């Protein structure tokens, strides 16, 4: 290695953290890190409280890191038909680039779904016996009653209270150090995400008795599939409430007095979103050039909306598909592999070449 570069190399993580605009949730970068000590010391932007928790609970950090892929995939599912599709940047420690420097509705959703993802990942790891600091919910013991009568707590109830508590301590740590509008917004949306997971905690039971008479029941609490949380937060995104800081700077109020004050379950934002039509570094917009659009749709994924009126290119592609499926007794369905030709429509690039500049 070149001698001058050899001297600089040990300082690159610090240099990177200094050069990149500060984004609150640098812990998202944990999905790409290695061992716990390397992760705790080199993830840019972690505050001291987050590093303390990271060193103290390496097994929890592994669960959080694995969970990043899950909630980013859910974000991409929810936005799959929109101009901004929750695409991540592998070489950016914020995952989403400058998008999160804006206090937009999209930023609100990302903070909420990521906070929810941490709760879900930690709680699941607790129930699976992967964490030293928690296990199944210790409070769910003995006998209890519901609308169907008496039952015994059994099995392994998901310890969601631990997941919520740890997620709040870790995720909110950096926001609590700031008193600005963005910090307050992020804290609110983080909490909304945590509450969303808990909202879908459901009681599951197993019956015991002769011929399934259910004379005895054993029950436990279980989290629903994360898709339910994603769908719920998506509805909250569509109904997100624009707010402004109050006069003393300790909270916010609705920007439009015709709207009700946001509840703890609502998502809030300060800034209007860009249209995401063209690549814009400052707005965190990747643009829609090259995105696949639906020629027959009238929704957000239509070629007219997705391509922002620029038009689209059409290419003929072939794909392998199942065909001539037949049911065979008993009990299988057998199909042939067939080649299918179809048209794929992709959005044209703007006439200006600026869109092609990499972010």
Curated annotation (Swiss-Prot):
InterPro entries referenced in this protein's UniProt entry, alphabetically: Wnt (IPR005817), Wnt2 (IPR009140), Wnt_C (IPR043158), Wnt_CS (IPR018161)
Domain of life: Eukaryota
Positions bearing carbohydrate: 294
Ranges in a coiled coil: none
CDD domains: Wnt_Wnt2
GO annotations of cellular component type: extracellular space
Lipidation (O-palmitoleoyl serine): 211
Compartments reported by the entry: Secreted, Extracellular space, Extracellular matrix
Disulfide bonds: 75-86, 126-134, 136-156, 205-219, 207-214, 277-308, 293-303, 307-347, 323-338, 325-335, 330-331
Record note on modification: Palmitoleoylation is required for efficient binding to frizzled receptors. Depalmitoleoylation leads to Wnt signaling pathway inhibition.
Secretion signal, residue range per the UniProt entry: 1-25
Keywords, in A-Z order: Developmental protein, Disulfide bond, Extracellular matrix, Glycoprotein, Lipoprotein, Secreted, Signal, Wnt signaling pathway
One protein family per Pfam: wnt
Keyword Lyase: no
GO BP, sorted A to Z: animal organ development; canonical Wnt signaling pathway; cell fate commitment; neuron differentiation
GO molecular function: cytokine activity; frizzled binding
Family of the protein in this entry: Belongs to the Wnt family.
Chain's role: Ligand for members of the frizzled family of seven transmembrane receptors. Probable developmental protein. May be a signaling molecule which affects the development of discrete regions of tissues. Is likely to signal over only few cell diameters.
Protein name: Protein Wnt-2
Encoding gene per record: WNT2
């Amino acid at each position: 290695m070149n001698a001058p570069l050899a001297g600089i190399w040990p300082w690159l993580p610090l240099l990177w953290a200094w050069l990149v605009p500060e984004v609150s949730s640098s812990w998202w970068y944990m999905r790409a890190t290695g061992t716990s000590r390397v992760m705790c010391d080199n993830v840019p932007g972690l505050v001291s409280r987050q590093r303390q928790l990271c060193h103290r609970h390496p097994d929890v950090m592994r669960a959080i890191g694995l969970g990043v892929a899950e909630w980013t995939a859910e974000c991409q599912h929810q936005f799959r038909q929109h101009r901004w599709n929750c695409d991540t940047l592998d070489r950016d420690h914020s995952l989403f680039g400058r998008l999160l420097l804006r206090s937009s509705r999209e930023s609100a959703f990302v903070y909420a779904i990521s906070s929810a993802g941490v709760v879900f990942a930690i709680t699941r790891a607790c129930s699976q016996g992967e964490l030293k600091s928690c296990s199944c919910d210790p409070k769910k013991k003995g006998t209890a009653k519901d609308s169907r009568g008496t039952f015994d707590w059994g099995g392994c109830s998901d310890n969601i209270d631990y997941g919520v508590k740890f997620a709040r301590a870790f995720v909110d740590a950096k926001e609590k150090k700031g008193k600005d509008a963005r910090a307050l917004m992020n804290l609110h949306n983080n909490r909304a995400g945590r509450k969303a997971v808990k909202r879908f905690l459901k009681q599951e039971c197993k019956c015991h008795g002769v011929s399934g008479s259910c004379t005895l029941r054993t029950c436990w609490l279980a989290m629903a599939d994360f898709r339910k949380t994603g769908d719920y937060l998506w509805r909250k995104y569509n109904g997100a409430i624009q707010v402004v800081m109050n006069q003393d700077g300790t909270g916010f109020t609705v920007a439009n007095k015709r709207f009700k004050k946001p509840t703890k379950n609502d998502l809030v934002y300060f800034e209007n979103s860009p249209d995401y039509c063209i690549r814009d570094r400052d707005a965190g917009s990747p643009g829609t050039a090259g995105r696949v659009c639906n020629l027959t749709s009238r929704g957000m994924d239509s070629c007219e909306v997705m391509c922002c009126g620029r038009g689209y290119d059409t290419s003929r592609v072939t794909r392998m598909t199942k065909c001539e499926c037949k049911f065979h007794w008993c009990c299988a369905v057998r199909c042939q592999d067939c080649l299918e030709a179809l048209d794929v429509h992709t959005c044209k690039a703007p006439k200006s070449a600026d869109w092609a500049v990499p972010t």
